[in-house]
Amino acid sequence: MLTQKQLVQILGNPESYNIEITTSTTNMDKFCQAICAFSNDLPGDDKSGYLIIGAEDNGKLSGLRVDDGLLLKMTNIRTDGNILPQPVMTVERFVLEGGDLLVVEVKPSEFPPVRYRGRIWVRIGPRKSIASEAEEKILMERRISNIRTFDAMPCIGTTLANIDINP
């Protein structure tokens, strides 16, 4: 997760392919789409994506006060069944002068494509959109490359004594 110093530095920069900043606290569709897009990690650079709630695009804090209800709403996104496979994410509140920030860190999925309500969302620069066929193909190929077959997987707990060399 980001440190408070890193968070303040991010707020001084515009949105990018792995940063989304918003003042909204109620647009769950927008949040889920962003989390899905960050999970898909279309550039393939294995960097986390950050959804920052409580600031405007110019970095100015909106004066948000993050309560337990908002924290619970955001953490429930992971398990509500709308984003599959489930995203790997952490949610943290930061208290700053001028208001709170709620930061959702989303790790890239090992098994893309990740779908929100059946649609594959990707992030191209500072905007998110539904994946094209070509983008979907890239994500599917990444999934296939991450799946190891049984003969390439380690057999944990075995030793050389377990190998039968006599047919």
Where are these regions (language model features)?
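Conserved N-terminal catalytic/coupling substructures associated with nucleotide/phosphate chemistry
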Residues: 1-167
